[in-house]
Design a protein with these regions (language model features):
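Juxtamembrane or sensor-core-proximal signal-transducing alpha helices
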Residues: 2-24
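Histidine- and acidic-residue-rich, metal-dependent catalytic cores
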Residues: 28-182
């Protein structure tokens, strides 16, 4: 996994050092936010790193497919990988009593927990509003907001379905669920 990321980084570095530096800072900031959120949640140790690794694996596998090769540019892949750690950033607004609760959440607690997706979208918009990289900003927003949408339309926060859900949010959702059941 990491050699692939490293190779991708080297390619960007050779193409444009300024973009490589910006990508590095964006990646470090995303990882920092994610670590801050994860430190509040006793139940997710390593979740951020694992889901980022799963997203990386899926994107690299998809890039080998003829259909996705046309859709997945190197910049897009880099942006999705860098945005992946931010998918749960909205949990920073979730009370500790819910984040750290052992056992099953009540219906009311679950409703509060579900707000982390919409909260994450807002946090991304506010935090990165002045970032020149509009593509990263949009991808990060959509990954945070839509990673709990379901293909059948029964997800949250917006009840999007099928192709209404951005590809990167669907990829993040698969990584998130896979990590939860592993």
């Amino acid at each position: 996994i990491f050699p692939t990321i490293l190779l991708l980084g080297i390619y960007i570095d050779f193409e444009n050092p300024a973009i490589r530096k910006l990508t590095m800072y964006t990646d470090e900031m995303a990882d920092g936010f994610a670590t801050m959120v994860e430190s509040r949640d006793n139940n997710t140790g390593g979740h951020i790193k694992r889901t980022k690794a799963y997203v990386t694996l899926m994107l690299n596998k998809m890039r080998g497919d003829r259909y996705y090769r046309r859709v997945l540019s190197r910049d897009y892949i880099t942006n999705v990988i860098n945005a992946a750690p931010l998918h749960d950033v909205g949990k920073i607004a979730t009370p500790d009593s819910i984040l750290q609760k052992p056992g099953k959440l009540t219906d009311e607690e679950y409703a509060i927990m579900k707000r982390h997706a919409a909260d994450g979208g807002k946090i991304i918009q506010q935090t990165f509003r002045d970032l020149d990289d509009a593509d990263f900003r949009q991808i990060a927003y959509e990954v945070a907001r839509f990673h709990h949408e379901k293909y059948n339309g029964k997800g949250y926060p917006d009840g999007l379905k099928a192709e209404e859900i951005p590809l990167h949010a669907r990829i993040m959702a698969v990584a998130d669920v896979f990590d939860a059941v592993s």
